[in-house]
Amino acid sequence: MRNSIFEQEETFQDLSLRPKSIEKFVGQQRVVENLQVFIDSAQKRNDSLDHVLFCGPPGLGKTTLAHIISNELESRIHTTAGPLLSKAGDIAAILTNLHKNDILFIDEIHRLPSAVEEVLYPAMEDYHLDLIVGDGPAAKSIRINLAKFTLVAATTRIGMLSNPLRDRFGITLRLDFYTVSELLQLLQQAAERLSVNIENGAMIELAKRSRGTPRIALRLLKRVRDFLEVSDSDVITREFADLALNKMEVDQFGLDKLDYTYMDFIAKNYSDNPVGIKTIAAAISEKEDSIEELIEPYLIKIGFLSRTQRGRRLTGKALDYLSTINSARLP
């Protein structure tokens, strides 16, 4: 399993750092501008917002935007996740308790079983449920009308959604990795709210090592703050941040120990040939889903990895970087 600073449970403090309104949301400019139009239009029509699907890598703000939609529309939000909905009755119980204009947020919707998906089809399209009651010859179909609600869903694997489910979302918004300048703006806001005494150069260093991901940027800020609190310093300088990040084994690209384990395995055993995900997962004792969602997207983003149908292959850029790093490790 992944043992990393990048994989930790959200705390109450994490939640308190989330923006509550769309104007306070940092980054994802195109997504935010379009979402504002859709929200304003729904409010002008005095109608429910069309169903919304957010897709993109973890930690970019999909859940935050779902809650912002609820706040902007002044609607109640009900939250659940794909892995929690194992049978049709689970989703039916939630849907029948929704009120008009409520928001239902389903995280990891790509992990819904097909039986649950099929219940959602008529609920999303016509706002009713068709349930089978009883068994055998005595079984009968019952239709239950639902309040007009908005389904907001998030996925890191949009390709795993069935076409019928994906097509029922009227709004699909794709989130991308953040720029360093966007992360810097986010860190400035967070440092002020957390009362962290940090220089601008240190925040730039944090932003560069945050893998383009706000969630990681905030976690690194708090961990570097921990180093500050047990030191003799009273401010986080660039040098202090660099020292703390190096102690946490977060390099200049934001790569951590597991990223190196992944790349080292491929470089040492398959440097000239592609390798399959199952082989990698078995070798580094990690789940395929975790590799595909948490490791590979960023390696592809920075040009370290090529992913094809034949398998994974490290790029020349990655191999050169590993060679430099490994040379530095030698006594």
Swiss-Prot record:
- Identify which top EC class this enzyme belongs to: hydrolase
Q: Where is this region: Large ATPase domain (RuvB-L)?
A: 1-178
Q: Can you say where in the cell this protein is located?
A: Cytoplasm
Q: Which residues bind Mg(2+)?
A: 63
Q: Where is this region: Head domain (RuvB-H)?
A: 252-331
Q: Which positions are annotated as binding ATP?
A: 17-18, 59, 62-64, 125-127, 168, 178, 215
Which transformation does this protein catalyse, written as a reaction? ATP + H2O = ADP + phosphate + H(+)
Q: Which GO terms describe its molecular function?
A: ATP binding; ATP hydrolysis activity; four-way junction DNA binding; four-way junction helicase activity
InterPro entries linked: AAA+_ATPase, AAA_lid_4, DNA_helicase_Holl-junc_RuvB, P-loop_NTPase, RuvB-like_N, RuvB_C, WH-like_DNA-bd_sf, WH_DNA-bd_sf
Annotated residues that bind DNA are located at 307, 312
The membrane-spanning stretches of this chain are: none
- Which UniProt keywords are present, listed alphabetically? ATP-binding, Cytoplasm, DNA damage, DNA recombination, DNA repair, DNA-binding, Hydrolase, Nucleotide-binding
* Chain residue ranges for the region called Small ATPAse domain (RuvB-S): 179-249
Domain topic, free-text comment: Has 3 domains, the large (RuvB-L) and small ATPase (RuvB-S) domains and the C-terminal head (RuvB-H) domain. The head domain binds DNA, while the ATPase domains jointly bind ATP, ADP or are empty depending on the state of the subunit in the translocation cycle. During a single DNA translocation step the structure of each domain remains the same, but their relative positions change.
Q: Which family does it belong to?
A: Belongs to the RuvB family.
Function, please? The RuvA-RuvB-RuvC complex processes Holliday junction (HJ) DNA during genetic recombination and DNA repair, while the RuvA-RuvB complex plays an important role in the rescue of blocked DNA replication forks via replication fork reversal (RFR). RuvA specifically binds to HJ cruciform DNA, conferring on it an open structure. The RuvB hexamer acts as an ATP-dependent pump, pulling dsDNA into and through the RuvAB complex. RuvB forms 2 homohexamers on either side of HJ DNA bound by 1 or 2 RuvA tetramers; 4 subunits per hexamer contact DNA at a time.
**What is the protein name for this chain?**
Holliday junction branch migration complex subunit RuvB
Species classification: Bacteria, Pseudomonadati, Pseudomonadota, Alphaproteobacteria, Rickettsiales
